[in-house]
């Protein structure tokens, strides 16, 4: 998936040879810069791998959680309101209607 989109690997960067000209760049500076790029590539590759694994785990957890959710019963809003009213009467008694 990702390998199709990325054109360079850390190994490609490491093994790249540049021709030198009369007034070319200092090879030591280029090597240091390429070393930094290689480290970044390796870090990015590792981070992508970890995120892909985490993504798979989360998808599995979501799938399992959706399977565990109970099927809703045929309780209607009227039933809920009736139960709530009975509970209020039981808890508050006549205080609820006196005020």
UniProtKB/Swiss-Prot annotation:
Residues 34-71 form a coiled coil. It comes from the Bacteria. It is found in: Cytoplasm. It holds the Pfam family DivIVA. Belongs to the GpsB family. One of its GO terms (cellular component) is cytoplasm. This is Cell cycle protein GpsB. Divisome component that associates with the complex late in its assembly, after the Z-ring is formed, and is dependent on DivIC and PBP2B for its recruitment to the divisome. Together with EzrA, is a key component of the system that regulates PBP1 localization during cell cycle progression. Its main role could be the removal of PBP1 from the cell pole after pole maturation is completed. Also contributes to the recruitment of PBP1 to the division complex. Not essential for septum formation. Its main location: cytoplasm. The keyword Thylakoid does not apply. PANTHER family: CELL CYCLE PROTEIN GPSB, CELL DIVISION PROTEIN DIVIVA. Forms polymers through the coiled coil domains. Interacts with PBP1, MreC and EzrA. InterPro entries: Cell_cycle_GpsB, DivIVA_domain, DivIVA_fam. GO terms for biological process: cell division; regulation of cell shape. Keywords: Cell cycle, Cell division, Cell shape, Coiled coil, Cytoplasm.
